[in-house]
Protein backbone atom coordinates (compact mmCIF):
# COMPACT_ATOMS: atom_id res chain seq x y z
CA UNK A 1 0.00 0.00 0.00
CA UNK A 2 2.78 2.41 0.91
CA UNK A 3 4.47 2.16 -2.49
CA UNK A 4 1.30 3.13 -4.38
CA UNK A 5 0.31 5.84 -1.89
CA UNK A 6 3.69 7.48 -2.51
CA UNK A 7 2.56 7.76 -6.10
CA UNK A 8 -0.63 9.45 -4.92
CA UNK A 9 -2.94 6.49 -5.53
CA UNK A 10 -4.75 5.06 -2.53
CA UNK A 11 -6.35 1.67 -2.09
CA UNK A 12 -9.80 2.67 -3.43
CA UNK A 13 -8.41 4.36 -6.54
CA UNK A 14 -6.06 1.43 -7.20
CA UNK A 15 -8.99 -1.01 -6.95
CA UNK A 16 -11.15 1.14 -9.25
CA UNK A 17 -8.39 1.16 -11.86
CA UNK A 18 -7.87 -2.57 -11.43
CA UNK A 19 -11.57 -3.29 -12.03
CA UNK A 20 -11.50 -1.08 -15.16
CA UNK A 21 -8.51 -3.12 -16.39
CA UNK A 22 -10.20 -6.47 -15.59
CA UNK A 23 -7.51 -7.26 -12.98
CA UNK A 24 -4.90 -7.21 -15.75
CA UNK A 25 -1.80 -5.29 -16.70
CA UNK A 26 -2.83 -2.48 -19.07
CA UNK A 27 -0.20 -3.60 -21.60
CA UNK A 28 0.36 -7.37 -21.59
CA UNK A 29 -2.92 -8.39 -19.89
CA UNK A 30 -1.17 -10.49 -17.23
CA UNK A 31 -3.54 -11.11 -14.32
CA UNK A 32 -2.78 -9.55 -10.95
CA UNK A 33 -1.07 -12.10 -8.71
CA UNK A 34 -3.34 -13.31 -5.92
CA UNK A 35 -5.12 -10.01 -5.41
CA UNK A 36 -1.93 -8.52 -3.97
CA UNK A 37 -2.37 -4.74 -3.77
CA UNK A 38 1.25 -4.10 -4.75
CA UNK A 39 1.56 -6.60 -7.59
CA UNK A 40 1.05 -3.88 -10.24
CA UNK A 41 2.91 -0.61 -10.57
CA UNK A 42 1.13 2.73 -10.95
CA UNK A 43 2.24 4.08 -14.33
CA UNK A 44 2.46 7.83 -14.78
CA UNK A 45 3.23 10.09 -17.68
CA UNK A 46 6.80 11.23 -16.91
CA UNK A 47 6.13 14.75 -18.19
CA UNK A 48 2.70 15.54 -16.75
CA UNK A 49 2.64 13.13 -13.82
CA UNK A 50 -0.86 11.98 -14.80
CA UNK A 51 -1.74 8.41 -13.88
CA UNK A 52 -2.07 6.29 -17.04
CA UNK A 53 -2.81 2.86 -15.61
CA UNK A 54 -1.52 -0.17 -13.75
CA UNK A 55 1.35 -2.19 -15.20
CA UNK A 56 3.09 -5.40 -14.26
CA UNK A 57 6.75 -5.07 -13.29
CA UNK A 58 7.98 -6.29 -16.70
CA UNK A 59 5.90 -3.82 -18.71
CA UNK A 60 6.74 -0.97 -16.36
CA UNK A 61 10.45 -1.73 -16.70
CA UNK A 62 10.16 -2.00 -20.49
CA UNK A 63 8.57 1.45 -20.75
CA UNK A 64 11.15 2.92 -18.40
CA UNK A 65 14.01 1.35 -20.37
CA UNK A 66 12.97 3.14 -23.59
CA UNK A 67 12.08 6.35 -21.79
CA UNK A 68 8.50 6.32 -23.16
CA UNK A 69 10.01 7.12 -26.56
CA UNK A 70 7.48 6.19 -29.26
CA UNK A 71 10.12 6.24 -32.00
CA UNK A 72 12.22 3.72 -30.10
CA UNK A 73 9.20 1.50 -29.45
CA UNK A 74 8.21 1.62 -33.14
CA UNK A 75 11.77 0.75 -34.15
CA UNK A 76 11.73 -2.21 -31.78
CA UNK A 77 8.46 -3.45 -33.30
CA UNK A 78 9.87 -3.12 -36.82
CA UNK A 79 12.99 -4.99 -35.77
CA UNK A 80 10.98 -7.89 -34.34
CA UNK A 81 8.67 -8.00 -37.36
CA UNK A 82 11.68 -8.15 -39.68
CA UNK A 83 12.81 -11.40 -38.04
CA UNK A 84 9.42 -13.13 -37.79
PLM features: what roles do these ranges have?
Residues 1-41, 46-84:
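Contiguous alpha-helical segments
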Amino acid sequence: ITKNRKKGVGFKEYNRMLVEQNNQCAVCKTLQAGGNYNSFMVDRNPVTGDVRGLLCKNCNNALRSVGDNLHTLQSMIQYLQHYE
